[in-house]
Amino acid sequence: MAIGLIGRKVGMTRIFTEDGVSIPVTVIEVAGNRVTQVKTLETDGYRALQVTTGTKKANRITKAEAGHFAKGGVEAGRGLWEMRLADGEGEGIEVGAELNVDIFAETVKVDVTGQSKGKGFQGGVKRWNFRTQDMTHGNSLAHRSNGSIGQNQTPGRVFKGKKMSGHMGAEQVTTQNLHVVRVDSERNLILVRGAVPGATNGDLIIKPAVKA
């Protein structure tokens, strides 16, 4: 896996090409990502980078977290994220180093991971795009019902994994192959074409596209 960055969704806007074509873009702010730990095969059994970003009030940090940040010699951030490294990746990166948007200067496409917007408890029509039942023709109570979920005597039960009503959203989602429109090093911004998961100010993980 490639080295990525932790950013924050600012919102959406649009930019224009030289030909006057409007491109919808999502603006992602990437403050400096501080390396808090470098995991190795010898000490941890796998290779990875652990980073933090942003700030956190001192009274909201546990003793364990405070000790971990102090050991790395970095300012406490709002969270910890880990990125696996393949052989040969991350060479020369040490604890305390800071990663910024410049690492995406030559990147064409990225995968963006975030937590989708929570929708609460939803029915099958909204959650799974089920077709509604007849509005008339004798149907007066089950317009948006899931319908038959257990068949008849055989099998006479509901299979595991059956799409039904339930909690929708608020889960980790990755949008793949988003085109990088612009990298603004001065303002620590990345502009990607299209939408990314989650609400404004939500944390995002940006990595070079796996399928590019």
From Swiss-Prot:
The modification N5-methylglutamine is found at residue 153. One of its GO terms (biological process) is translation. Methylated by PrmB. GO terms for cellular component: cytosolic large ribosomal subunit. Pfam families: Ribosomal_L3. Gene3D superfamilies: 3.30.160.810, Translation factors. Keywords: Methylation, Ribonucleoprotein, Ribosomal protein, RNA-binding, rRNA-binding. InterPro entries: Ribosomal_uL3 (IPR000597), Ribosomal_uL3_bac/org-type (IPR019927), Ribosomal_uL3_CS (IPR019926), Transl_B-barrel_sf (IPR009000). GO terms for molecular function: rRNA binding; structural constituent of ribosome. PANTHER family: 50S RIBOSOMAL PROTEIN L3, LARGE RIBOSOMAL SUBUNIT PROTEIN UL3C. Part of the 50S ribosomal subunit. Forms a cluster with proteins L14 and L19. One of the primary rRNA binding proteins, it binds directly near the 3'-end of the 23S rRNA, where it nucleates assembly of the 50S subunit. NCBIfam families: L3_bact. Belongs to the universal ribosomal protein uL3 family. This is Large ribosomal subunit protein uL3. It comes from Shewanella denitrificans (strain OS217 / ATCC BAA-1090 / DSM 15013). The gene is rplC.
